[in-house]
Amino acid sequence: MLKRNPISNNFIYFFGALGGLLFGYDTGVISGAMLFIGKELEIQTGSFEDGFITASVLLGAILGAAIIGPMSDKLGRKKLLLSAAIIFFVGALGSGIGFNYTLLVTSRVLLGIAVGAASALIPTYLAELSPADKRGGIGTLFQLMIMTGIFLAYVSNEWLSPSGWLGLNQNVGWHWMLGLAAVPAALLFIGG
């Protein structure tokens, strides 16, 4: 349990839970981006490649959660959370650049590894940092941030689509949709 003032504790809880926001954003944003990715990369809707772009995050998440659990007791949750933030950042940038199928899938697998790591690390990390009488509320912060991330993904999908608020070209908007996740990833690293 932390022995700092409440502002410092809240700061740590918020930044720790940013991994949940990234989890939600990275799993939700693909629904809007796929409408335009297929056109630019010439991938047929409903094809194996189309489905694999979406599923690659989940495959990475399985790997990330399986690997990070045993490592967290040896290396510490904070170090691994910072490592996950770096992986989130690299994966988001790679997805945003995504000029070909291989780069996009590889970047999304990296994002999945970070999602799996965050899922295994953050709830325990927040529980260890919080006082017993506030542990339940602070523990739900991770889940709240996942839902907030999904909501923000749908907002960005709307705003960055050709018919959306910013009206970006379909070959530009999806890159921004996926790449924007680098911002909270950088904040997670800085705040961690």
Name each model-derived stretch.
Residues 1-192:
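Transmembrane-helix signature of 12-pass secondary carriers
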